[in-house]
Amino acid sequence: MIKEELNLWAEGVEFKHWDAYYNFILSVLNFLCIEEYELSVVLCNNEYIQKLNSAFRQKSEPTDVLSFNYLEENGQINHKIQGDLIISLEYLEFSSLEFNVEMYDELQRNTIHGILHLIGYTHETNDFQNEEMLVIQEKVLRETRRVF
């Protein structure tokens, strides 16, 4: 039986665009040919993500997105997801100013980024021209863009 479950919620932040965001995530999963998924996405503040970053990565600082994959990683790209994404809207507000982009563009980009990690992609650098994962990320963003 194919499982298709997507849960969204907020921790310590207000978010008003749940329907649009839900549909955006479904479009990303469809674009990436994800056959089966159990995915939870938490939109949060810096305090919430910093606690998780400290507990699981031993980094006592906030970050943009954390991904937690509950499937066995085999070094290959998987077309199933069982995991969680934690995304700090507070952090994205800062980075959107730094990169001179809309905050919702950063939300979409970081959501795609986290999903790519959950299906097995990794990157060593932040080179958007040459890192396969980041090239794919930007392609998916272009193709599924502007839902807010």
Swiss-Prot record:
Organism: Borrelia hermsii (strain HS1 / DAH)
Entry-linked InterPro entries: MetalPrtase_cat_dom_sf_prd, YbeY, YbeY_CS
GO biological process, one term: rRNA processing
Entry's cofactor comment: Binds 1 zinc ion.
HAMAP family for this protein: Endoribonucl_YbeY (MF_00009)
Binding site for Zn(2+): 113, 117, 123
Name of this protein: Endoribonuclease YbeY
Membrane-traversing stretches: none
